Design a protein with these regions (language model features):
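Soluble non-cytosolic domains of exported or imported proteins
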Residues: 2-7, 116, 120-128, 177-184, ...
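Extracellular LysM carbohydrate-binding repeats and other cell-envelope/extracellular binding modules
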Residues: 3-51
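Solvent-exposed loop/turn segments at secondary-structure junctions
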Residues: 19, 42-43, 104-107, 144, ...
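Helix-enriched interaction subdomains in cytosolic or periplasmic regions
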Residues: 31-36, 41-78
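A short, glycine/acidic-enriched catalytic loop
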Residues: 108-121, 213-243
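Active-site-adjacent mobile loop/cap segments within catalytic or ligand-binding domains
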Residues: 214, 225-228, 251-314
Length: 314
């Protein structure tokens, strides 16, 4: 297409992603290599505004370029009916790309615990925190990909998140039963998207993977972080996250924070190509005190907030 304008290229990509999200097209252009090109983006030299003839209708920006905060209604069904309206509050994170991976999903529930007769499954709680983070990033202009996706869960406020196994990955692909295949599938998606954005000149690309650990039920642990080996940028990000959590623990919870950062041979850290990659463990799903971090919706939101605020402070 000979398009060398970053904003225009990103607008075309966002247009195709939106069509995929809304079910208008059934394939992912990253995989199929087929782009749908809006006529106005290529052939109209000036931004056009069209107003629906219905009384009280709001102007619709056809340009598809980064919107002004509050300029248009944006809907993301993945967040659920209550929160699908996701207004743009700022463009602070415009030009930055995030790949968000919630651990496990599909046939793999991950770690399990129990509380008052209810089963607690790692994949459900990791997904809810990750989805909350996703919404915050989108509200401030980031491009964010939710790699593991549930078609009907949305953001949930109840303490006990019901287990299901209908999660898919980006592109509506079924999650394999084999563990290595599952991990490689996610890495392939992230690497393909990373390469595409790199071609468009995007330098700030970050992968965040969120899990819940499982230890002996007496072992209480604070949120801790792994970063990609031999990646100074990943270590720096993990350090910033650790610092943020330490500040919040000490100011809001009034207790000492014992989180850590380290490296570890984790498949997703070793086999993805984003400039930065951090793997987050939210707590011990077996421990009664750590479970409160997961069961209480405001705590899940706080976890997402602190991760998000770290990005906003960069």
């Amino acid at each position: 297409l000979k398009i060398d304008d970053w904003k225009k290229a990103k607008a075309i990509a966002d247009y195709n992603h939106a069509l995929r999200e809304q079910g208008i097209r059934d394939d992912n252009f990253i995989h199929s290599r087929r782009l749908w090109i809006p006529w106005h983006l290529v052939h109209c030299t000036e931004e056009e505004v069209v107003v629906d003839k219905k009384p009280g209708a709001r102007p619709v920006n056809l340009g598809g370029l980064p919107a002004e905060p509050g300029s248009a209604e944006r809907r993301y069904p993945i967040f659920g009916k209550t929160l699908e309206k996701t207004p743009l509050l700022s463009n602070r994170l415009n030009g930055r790309v995030f790949y968000l991976v919630s651990g496990h999903g599909g046939p793999d529930t991950g770690a399990q615990g129990s509380h008052d007769g209810h089963d607690l499954c790692e994949d459900e709680y990791a997904y809810d925190v990750t989805l909350r983070l996703m919404r915050l990033l989108l509200q401030h202009g980031a491009t964010a990909y939710m790699i593991v996706r549930d078609p009907n869960d949305g953001i949930r406020d109840n303490p006990y998140l019901k287990l299901d196994k209908d999660e898919v990955v980006w592109g509506n692909k079924k999650i394999p039963f084999d563990q290595k295949e599952r991990l490689q599938q996610r890495c392939d998606i992230i690497n393909q998207l990373t390469a595409e954005h790199k071609k468009w000149g995007v330098k700030q690309q970050t992968m965040i993977e969120i899990h819940v650990d499982s230890r002996h039920q007496d072992k209480r642990i604070d949120v801790f972080f792994y970063h990609r080996k031999s990646s100074g940028a990943s270590k720096t990000l993990a350090t910033k996250l650790l610092t943020k959590f330490k500040q919040e623990y000490e100011s809001q919870l009034d207790r000492t924070y014992h989180g850590t950062i380290s490296t570890r041979n984790l498949y997703s850290l070793d086999n993805t190509q984003t400039p930065r990659a951090v793997y987050i463990e939210l707590g011990n799903i077996q421990n009664e005190l750590d479970q409160q971090r997961l069961l209480i919706r405001t705590n899940r939101q706080a976890l997402a907030n602190w991760i998000f605020q770290t990005f906003m402070s960069e």
